[in-house]
Amino acid sequence: MSKPSGSFQEHWDRVYDSSDVDKLGWWEAVPEKSLHLIRQCGLGKDDLILDIGTGASTLIDRLLDDGHRNIIASDISEKALQALKHRLGPERASRVTWIVDDVTRPQHLCHLRDVCLWHDRAVLHFLTEEPQRQAYLNTLRAVLKVGGFAIIAAFHLTGADKCSGLPIHKYDQTLLAEFLGEDFLLEDHFQYTYHTPSGSPRPYIYTRFRRLR
């Protein structure tokens, strides 16, 4: 499988090489807010779930625990996904489809279809240039089925200007709705202040949209 190139991949490979996963500034032992929104969707166990920017997230562990059988974990960093595979172990890792790709320049994601749930915690807000944001939206629209759900969590307007040394494009629910456009209905949203492993507060906006057409 070809690897995505460019500074984002190099940055995230360095991050996952240089720190224990549970010390990273976005680590969650239990991703409760994402799970809450996912469970609201009423998905079947074979419905296709695509997690964008998986990293070494425990969300995949929890989705497997919940009995989901059609999960794709995607990240620009192969090192991040390898860390997650190692934690899951061979048997559980074999139940997940793994895609190393850049959502803004997809080589593999763009071929997916009929995704029932697009989940993104903290990818979109790293895309600060309009062409990147448009490419992200193009990928989302290409793969997510009508009637499917998009759960997006990003740094809130009141949050930090940078994460992991990179600049951030911050959002609230209105800005996310404007970004996705009128083909997406905002069904739920809430603010949540996450605390990093070192104790620093990070205000997020969590949203759940349904694709109408």
PLM regions: where:
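Short catalytic micro-motifs in class I SAM-dependent methyltransferases
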Residues: 122-126
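A conserved beta-strand element that flanks and buttresses the S-adenosyl-L-methionine
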Residues: 119
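Class I (Rossmann-like) S-adenosyl-L-methionine-dependent methyltransferase catalytic domain
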Residues: 1-113, 127-213
